[in-house]
Amino acid sequence: MFLRHCITFTMIALLAGCAGFGSREALQGHGDPQQWRAHKAQLSSLDGWQINGKVGIRAPRDSGSGTLFWLQRQDYYDIRLAGPLGRGAARLTGRPGGVVLEVANQGRYEATSPEALLEEQLGWQLPVSHLVWWVRGLPAPDSKSKLTLDGDSRLASLDQDGWQVQYLSYTEQNGYWLPERLKLHGKDLDVTLVVKDWQPRQLGH
């Protein structure tokens, strides 16, 4: 179960680098579209961050929770899980073209992309490159999305590629309003993420 849990979250949490925005959004809710566009443009400038928090996973046959560390530096990522979810530790590092998953006392797994690693290890297909956007409170730009804005013109929820993401609370860090608690619901999988510490950065291109 440990390997399944670790790969499940880390693959969802993976990313394929930061791309540009599309115009494939359907907006609804109480927010102002112009304020949303300004908010989205500000968050798109973030190409680096460090996150510390907790993650919970619920699947039909098993569930678990643990701590999360996520370091993002443009297209490089270092994602680590520890605690009851892992009964040890797991670390995922990579950039486009190469991904390495290391699981304590179980082994090392490599692939050319997070999607390929997930398919190889579990036989599952998930939009694994989307969370780099979702964790910032943004829709992924490469597919259609349905967005519900809250009264502050931030995301209250989004539907994209068969996944539903709920934004339960936000926190302000260095002038950025960033998700603090979010829930992801997909087919046979629920993920809850609670960010305890956000350190957003603009690294430049």
UniProtKB/Swiss-Prot annotation:
* UniProt cross-references to SUPFAM superfamilies, sorted A to Z: Prokaryotic lipoproteins and lipoprotein localization factors
Q: How does it sit in the membrane?
A: Lipid-anchor
Q: Which domain of life is it from?
A: Bacteria
The record's Gene Ontology cellular component field reads: cell outer membrane
The processes (GO biological process) annotated in the record are: lipoprotein localization to outer membrane; protein transport
Key words, A-Z:
Cell outer membrane, Chaperone, Lipoprotein, Membrane, Palmitate, Protein transport, Signal, Transport
**Location, primary (coarse class):** membrane
Residues bearing a lipid moiety (N-palmitoyl cysteine)? 18
UniProt similarity note: Belongs to the LolB family.
Q: How does it assemble?
A: Monomer.
Q: What is this protein called?
A: Outer-membrane lipoprotein LolB
